[in-house]
């Protein structure tokens, strides 16, 4: 099986020598294609820091992270932007949807940035919307949607580009128990039926 994500002895420090906080201390693990891996731990244990390093929002202090065999800790500028755009999908706790765009436009945005033709964008958005049961909200703005609907729209946006890896940062944190259960079922569906590789922090 193909290794999608390889974490190789990474460390992350904050502060300076006299006042240093070690957020990640020599972590190594692999995630294979098609796996759904959940990282659990107490608040402040470094889970989100780890996800930020994998997503290139933050840089590791030492060690290496490989996605699809590519060492992402060495990427800069356009190469880094291209990697984020084409190989990663993000699902955030607070959704991060653009308030001025409809659900359809939020989901389509990632493909528009890649200059995908409009007909292909439309077909793909509608296919993903059907999978995640958000067809009825495609014309709505975020303020017109429930928390569960917003999270499913955010999930659709995350997978629309067929990324190698989807990163989910406490995706159920802002949801009630019913919506949280539904979202986890959707993520399971993405993983099992669409073979999406998922790394989730919870």
What is each residue range found by the language model?
Residues 2-202:
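ABC family nucleotide-binding domain
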